[in-house]
Amino acid sequence: MFTLPPISLYIHIPWCLKKCGYCDFYSYVSKEIIPENKYIEHLLRDFERDLSLINNRNINTIFIGGGTPSLLKNTSIKNLLNGIKKRKIISKNIEISIEANPKTLEYQNFIQYKNSGINRFSLGIQTFNSKMLKKIERTYNSKDAMNAIIESKKISDNINLDLMYGLPGQSLEEALSDLQIAIQCNPSHISWYQLTIEPNTVFYAKKIQTPHQDVVFNMLIEGDKLLKKAGYKKYEISSYSKFNYQCQHNLNYWNFGDYIGIGCGSHGKITQKNGEIIRTIKNKNINDFLSGKYINSVYQVSKRDKIFEYFMNVFRLYKPIFKKHFRENTNIEESFIEKNIQIAIQEGFLINQSDCWHTTKKGKNFLNSLLEIFLK
């Protein structure tokens, strides 16, 4: 029997202090006063509109991302969350996360965020190395980063640090030094991911070079060892947590759960009662969004795209992929992908068992090659 998956809420705040050269996320540099009150008002209207699509499900997690959400006043964040809570569709033990730039944070921010219901803080540190921070065009220094961590830990024990490796000119020793500093700070969660330079970025246009792939691979391998030794469990390709501190919002994405996306440039995935999945794409033009034109497009995901998107997410996790889970979340029988599965097994990417599939070490290391099999 087909059942609707859990559903989350993603809220996009598009403004930033500065557009970093490597960033391909949708954002605006805030050169003028941000129209906070108006934006919050339209976020709530956008939210109201999407509620008609979710079939009375409760929202299990909320993630406020960007951009730089911590640019908004604390009262704006509070008004936003209060407006959402009024609908009374929020799960009792909901995880509410906010992304934050160390440059924009003070102790008072964390207190007021917590009072608003936020119980998880994700700090975009990226690196503690001042030289590297300048290279990747971040707006803060290593002292700002440490201060943000110290202040956040006074308020919450549910702290994520975002760190990148493979930065331009970065050595193995420098990458591991970042990790060692992060581990000493003892956050509950560390996201340790490789910098990739996407085509629509300033770094791509400038032909900025990252370290050789062998050096980057060694960063990953040695970083894995450091994190494991320090008590962090790797549960996803770039995610490591202490016991019981996995990011529930991201886990919902990776388990192919549903999510509403509200805000300028956001997108959503919402499963219908008949098993079909629709995608919502919101307007990227801030002026249009603030005039009530929220939707850019809504479309139904094709059967083949549904399969690819499912595996693109679940293959990131370090756990078995149960065949029952595939059926329940795609409304497709596994016999439809039997040929694809056999090719993946022959290539050494997957192991087949009676009730599940396992990705091999080779499958994780060559994830793109594994995913290409499910495009056919």
Curated annotation (Swiss-Prot):
What's the superkingdom here?
A: Bacteria
Q: Which GO terms describe its biological process?
A: porphyrin-containing compound biosynthetic process
Cofactors, names only: [4Fe-4S] cluster
Q: Where does [4Fe-4S] cluster bind?
A: C16, C20, C23
Extract one GO molecular function annotation from the record.
Answer: metal ion binding
User: Can you list the GO cellular component terms from the UniProt entry?
Assistant: cytoplasm
Sorted keywords for this record are: 4Fe-4S, Chaperone, Cytoplasm, Heme, Iron, Iron-sulfur, Metal-binding, S-adenosyl-L-methionine
Any idea which positions bind S-adenosyl-L-methionine 2?
G67, T68, Q126, R138, D162
Q: What is its main location?
A: cytoplasm
Further remark: Might carry two S-adenosyl-L-methionine binding sites with only one binding to the iron-sulfur cluster.
Give the UniProt family note. Belongs to the anaerobic coproporphyrinogen-III oxidase family. HemW subfamily.
Record-linked PANTHER family:
COPROPORPHYRINIGEN III OXIDASE, RADICAL S-ADENOSYL METHIONINE DOMAIN-CONTAINING PROTEIN 1, MITOCHONDRIAL
Which protein is depicted?
Heme chaperone HemW
Source species: Buchnera aphidicola subsp. Acyrthosiphon pisum (strain APS) (Acyrthosiphon pisum symbiotic bacterium)
Please state the gene responsible for encoding this protein.
Answer: hemW
